[in-house]
Regions:
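Catalytic-core regions of core metabolic enzymes
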Residues: 1-234
Length: 234
């Protein structure tokens, strides 16, 4: 099993015609991820590596049906509106790769996601991956590199640093220890999902036997995680 994403996960890319989004779209497709559509207002009718582009999230869903997730790669000033659009159209998993978003706007996105039963990963993250099944975001880089670093197995990964997420996976793989799911949670002060919020997912996953965590100084997330582990005797 896995957490959050698997071989059946479908997602869109908001801001798909931007340079970074074009790259991550190709990397995800090459890995085998199921990107059903992209969104860039005013660019409907184009395609990016065979992925059709639409003017809005609603149009993607109208054409392809319900979509599990969205990767948002738009300028900071447009990120909140993009996230709101995805959430209000029923998208439940949102990966925000954009950085330098005002904290107040991040807080507003996280609040709306909570109210609507959606989950945000990021901002300022590389996304997440279930090895051999699906990756959302630029995590791992090109497909060949991703397949070399990430292999299927019993270790979950949570990391503030996108680069260290892959470094940890590579080290584990070299030691013969594959990964269930790896999540780059984001390096900003305010993010959508903390270590403690991911723990119940890993705890409920029978495939995950241990978790590797990479943290960075500052914030309360580590203390919250310790409290969760103590309370739940994990």
């Amino acid at each position: 099993m896995s957490i959050l994403v698997d071989k059946n996960t479908t997602f869109m890319v908001q801001g798909i015609t931007g340079r970074e989004a074009v790259n991550l779209t190709r990397e995800c497709l090459d890995y085998g991820s199921k990107i059903v559509g992209g969104v860039t207002p005013g660019r409907a009718g184009r395609d990016i590596y065979g992925v059709p582009v639409y003017d809005c999230v609603r149009d993607v869903i109208a054409r392809h049906g319900p979509v599990h997730g969205s990767v948002i790669s738009v300028p900071p000033g447009f990120t909140r509106d993009a996230a709101f659009e995805a959430i209000e159209n029923g998208v439940k998993l949102i990966v925000i790769v954009t950085e330098n978003i005002p904290r107040q706007e991040v807080a507003q996105m996280v609040e709306l996601a909570s109210l609507r039963g959606a989950r945000i990963i990021g901002p300022n993250c590389l996304g997440l991956i279930t090895p051999g099944e699906c990756k959302m975001g630029g995590i791992g880089g090109p497909a060949a590199n991703t397949k070399q670093a990430y292999t299927r197995g019993p270790i979950g990964i949570m990391s503030r640093s996108g680069g260290m997420t892959t470094e940890i996976a590579s080290t584990l793989t070299a030691a013969g220890l594959g990964q269930s799911t790896a999540v780059s949670i984001g390096g900003d002060a305010i993010i959508g999902t903390s270590y403690a919020e991911l723990m119940p997912y890993f705890e409920a996953d029978p495939e995950t036997q241990a978790i590797a965590i990479y943290s960075e100084p500052g914030g309360r997330m580590e203390a919250e995680l310790a409290e969760w582990v103590t309370t739940n005797k994990s």
